[in-house]
């Protein structure tokens, strides 16, 4: 790892989960931004690293790639995410292949889509009954229905929040109190299982974006405490969803629970328009000092 200043992004998604760019696309964009420390953290997938192993993508010189993953978890029936850094790709790939076969992923996404259709039918929303989810990608059932609902202006007139993918997902689709709630958690690991497999793969576990879930400060700290009890070593400090004061509050929690910190944009490409690699909405910067206590001790990949 080179000395001096660094340009860092430790959270991004590719076509191997719910992003829109390939591994090589991401590498090209990171090169253009002079990024030199980064991690591909697809949901429940290490496909980017397999692309590199197969020669389907190539690292450029002078960079440090931290092997990573974002594991989707269930906490009391709510979707929560755990990041793993410095993982063994073969160990994590074996776990993911056994837990999430393509057949199982397709079956789950189609079931989620059918449940979403049922809700929208009850709301007299307009959509094509023939749409399907047949690729097994993360959140595919949700995304297919979101795109279809937005093809019909009358749906947006009735429920304006339907045209905001992030708001619809977190405030309604995954919110048990919402009439648009669909349970996605029925086959997901707990925090404990996620941390255990990250550790088994030789990595370190970080609770992802603690403030993205719309919780109060007290509830957010409760969630962080659950992650700590499960064995997590760190938390994601910098993230595009943070509002004013969040970083300071997260820093206080990190000190209180003796947690390492990480940061990244959570870049998804066209699925989250406006969010750019490295800087998110243009004003985010992950400082090397925020990751230096741990980044040198985990497995990394270089050209």
Regions found by a protein language model. Name each.
Residues 1-79, 175, 181-272, 298:
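An N-terminally biased module of ancient metal coordination in phosphate/nucleic-acid-related enzymes
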Residues 58-221, 286-290:
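Extended substrate/RNA-proximal surfaces in nucleic-acid metabolism proteins
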Residues 232, 273-303:
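His/Asp/Glu-enriched, well-ordered alpha-helical/loop segment
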